[in-house]
């Protein structure tokens, strides 16, 4: 099995990692993780993942590198990966608003990239994920990335030209629906309904 590296170990990365583990009999020995938070690293180590000390180390020791950081952190992360990402590696971006071209430009590399828009129901294994691969991804890596998300819901490959609409409909809307449902429940509780 190819090594899959995660830069960032927040809620979404953790959900993806748990989905991968569920597909692999609970094993996490093929998963490498780096996060700036020692607490998150400790949690990943307890799950059985290989915790590394830098983003660069993740890139050097992983065939597929998942960028699971907030969009505002991309410039710094991409800069730190410039010397370790090659065209032999596949980069997966799960940040809203970050295009394939942006990732390649930041890395100064024409590596395979998969732009992904998961949504929060992925945390409950009920996600709907849109994936957009670059033209130079191998069939093997395309299948691996698809399966990373298929274990936690449904997946669909789309053209990158539709990604902004997908972000609005699929990526952001579940949070608003949750907020609306919570407001309804709070209202009922305030009316004495328990």
Regions found by a protein language model. Name each.
Residues 16-17, 81, 184:
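Hydrophobic residues within alpha-helices
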Residues 4-6, 31, 65, 92, ...:
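Hydrophobic packing within well-folded, soluble alpha/beta domains
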Residues 47, 55-60, 64-67, 71-131:
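Rossmann-like NAD(P)(H) cofactor-binding subdomain of soluble oxidoreductases
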